[in-house]
């Protein structure tokens, strides 16, 4: 044990937090989570241990701007102005200091290992009583599961130790410091330490004791470590559970270890042995270790599909059977290996349906509770995710247990990122930083290696590639050859990774960056000598309205076996709740706390909002990742299962044929499909529709019974086919009414019954409509070529740094947002049964014509206005965001009804999950409340739209809400939006894709850009 004086002054003088060679003082060795049961039955059933006591709750807290400001007296007693805070928590969430959001740039001046003199310091204290029996025998430990970023610990005024690495436990022996009755802990937490240079992850930078604190009492002679490994024969019919157990304390001949394996109430296998291992070298073997091997016949294998778990109980006892203590863990029999370029689980090639997940809560910062963890897992499972990458640090210990039990594959990642270094590997190639990096990797492995859900180790994130990585890669491969290691830094295919694991590599497009090129994922597989599997560690940047082009990745994954999936970036928006002057909550992002530097809304890349409400893009991910694929041939549906291990035992295929959303026939068939099997389903002869419209066949896989992760009736997969379009049209009855045209100096006015249309002759726009005496328009009907920029349109542009390649900057520079209409033509003609208005506009900026829009409006005796639009696009202007029409309707109706793709928001490059049907939703549901306002709510493939008294028909895309594109563009946060008068309607003949391969470079694929020179579309607008 390291001994230093107890005084605060000496601790401050040592400045351990600015020495990369000091990562801990007196911290105990890493190991799996312990509970020290004194009853083996309680260990088997995982009951709360009487030897494990939580110290979570209210602690006294005082905040100081620097450690030097902390008074020495605090070590002995609470300060008079101390506050009370809840542990675990981040102190920034209690109003102390400010959270800082930055992606790459370090939040402190880069001068490793030194940190600013102004180093916010939180002083925690807790008074507690100790059970006297704990003082009489054994060892009492204190466990801090997570403290950011470094801390010193005192107990009863005496210095205990020091720890850093904010995402792994720091555990200390308190036995020599405790006394009968009342005891006092004092914890001095520093916001910045040399460890902060290894923790430059894209996240909020927060501080404090943010994970659980507990006391653990272990006997003097104790289990100090245990590791379980599962081994198999070739066909997995026989397995061996290998358990290596290490003890600490007096090594006596009478000591024995028994390992028993349980499946529920049934003991499957058991073995007992004394300590003493195999001979290692000429000096012998480990006297304090023993390895037991238990044979298991026909084990029920673990996978994310079927997370079969056993329970291993490790008992330390004497020869006569007297139990000293027991530890236990869940065991999943599974094998992970790479063979012939494929990542295999239990001999089957995996397809990773993965997502990156930060530990984030909008109210609690980086504090994770069980309810939130379970909620995340259930949502992932319900949306066909099977894997999660712990980005970019080891998670709360409970997370892994939950992943074991619910079934998720886990990439466990070391808490190492040096993204802001220049070059990135400045520290990771420096041997002075090897000890700090080593502790972060080795302690992660030692804590988490017993979890079957952990199938891959990761050396960290975005830290370049240095010699330290190579050393740690070799250490893991030596200590745990049962799992592959991945690491993206330095080019994604270095010697420190078993898996090619690029981030944001595209399907077909190379990105030839200097030194670290990102090849297309298809090309990467074919590079000379390359035989590793490729799994994208990050892809499909889900920032705001994004995930365009996601289907293209999944087409490639299914086409090329060695393209084994990837991890979407990322799971949850990292917005935080703030309150306005009236106490109303709102969602904040970088800069909203006065934090500098900051990267604004770049913290919000989630498939779900911070409160776990899904983004529309989540449905697209669910659909592309679904485990059932469908093919239609005639009246035969072929259903293929992509499950590797699971037989469909809780699925029905529901099918329905509908004409323009009206059901004509339906049925339900039980699915009986084995792993990777097929089932043919023959549909009956379908009825012939009697009216015109689109005929669609929709199939849905429905789970009739609830599961551990879904409710009864859960839909896990679906597909639609357009069968035909019935052209047996009933002609409208002839109208004897003829619209009347009147012309004034300023307007053309058309009147039919109680309806009137007014076209302004100076502007050429439809300026007003009346039904009776009620005006229908608040603004004229005008062309629209722009959209409120998406995050993907903005890229890295900001006020102080313009990216001229970003779509929004190209549109601005070309004048798309500033363009004004010059009237070229506005004429009116009376036809035999209609009035025809003809207009032409040149949309110009600074004398340059960007678009020419020619329209005809034909108003007939039925009151239908047929609008034909022809648009010519200048050859030297950027491809526009949309080609359509917009106006502000006077009407505000509660509901919107449409025949088209839905129900969720969809865009041309993100619509495979949408279904063609007749949908009816509240107006409020047509707006997607992205925290950073942008273009949103589009519905594609629309044939008919009904809103209030109005109906539009054609083949178009639309969005409708209380917010104008102008307001969306000018507003920084959704809570600042105000409902405008009336309703804004945007009807597009064409709309550009949204992209999403990444959010910092133009990522809309060419096929989803509006690159043609001419466009035509038609609408029918009438009143019902």
Curated annotation (Swiss-Prot):
- Keywords in alphabetical order, please: Glycosidase, Hydrolase, Magnesium, Metal-binding, Sodium
As cofactor, the record names:
Mg(2+); Na(+)
Residues annotated for substrate binding in this entry = 103, 202, 462, 538-541, 605, 1000
How is the cofactor bound here? Binds 2 magnesium ions per monomer.
| Residues where Mg(2+) 2 binds | 598
The positions annotated for binding Mg(2+) 1 are: 417, 419, 462
Q: Per the record, what are the reactions this protein catalyses?
A: Hydrolysis of terminal non-reducing beta-D-galactose residues in beta-D-galactosides
Q: Name one GO biological process term.
A: lactose catabolic process
Q: E.C. number, please?
A: 3.2.1.23
One Gene Ontology term, aspect cellular component: beta-galactosidase complex
* Keyword ATP-binding attributed: no
Keyword Secreted annotated: no
**GO terms for MF:** beta-galactosidase activity; carbohydrate binding; magnesium ion binding
Q: For site (Transition state stabilizer), what residue positions does UniProt give?
A: 358, 392
Binding of Na(+), residues: 202, 602, 605
Family, per entry:
Belongs to the glycosyl hydrolase 2 family.
Assembly notes: Homotetramer.
**Protein name, per record:** Beta-galactosidase
Source organism per entry reads: Escherichia coli O6:H1 (strain CFT073 / ATCC 700928 / UPEC)
Lineage, uppermost ranks = Bacteria, Pseudomonadati, Pseudomonadota, Gammaproteobacteria, Enterobacterales
